[in-house]
Amino acid sequence: MADQLTEEQIAEF
């Protein structure tokens, strides 16, 4: 699902 999140959003996780 990483493809659906931006690098900024991934940083939160």
Curated annotation (Swiss-Prot):
This is Calmodulin. Belongs to the calmodulin family. The keyword Calcium applies. It comes from the Eukaryota. This protein has four functional calcium-binding sites. Signal peptide: none annotated. The keyword Calcium applies. Calmodulin mediates the control of a large number of enzymes, ion channels and other proteins by Ca(2+). Among the enzymes to be stimulated by the calmodulin-Ca(2+) complex are a number of protein kinases and phosphatases. The modification N-acetylalanine is found at A2. Keywords: Acetylation, Calcium, Repeat. Residues 8-13 form the EF-hand domain. The lineage of its organism: Eukaryota, Sar, Alveolata, Ciliophora, Intramacronucleata. It comes from Tetrahymena thermophila.
